[in-house]
Amino acid sequence: SLTGRDRGQLMLVVAEEGDFLLLANGRARRAENPKRKRRKHVSLQGPCDERTRLKLQSESRLTNSEIRKALALWTGDENAN
């Protein structure tokens, strides 16, 4: 996130709604209540792991635990679950 109270936080894009992205991190921003943010206020950092990508593409919802695990894998912090 580039702006707002969540500036600098790493989040996973869980869905898209036109010019908006729905972001979650599995803790403060949970899967059932993702943050709605304009694309221009978000810096895309890179792709997620294959398992997470396939689950998102299959239209099934990620759990908060799966979101935290995907972010931990991306940052290399295996103990951040």
Regions found by a protein language model. Give the residues of each.
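Ferredoxin-like alpha/beta domains used as RNA- or RNAP-binding modules
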Residues: 12-81
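Short, charged/polar N-terminal "headpieces" of proteins
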Residues: 1-16
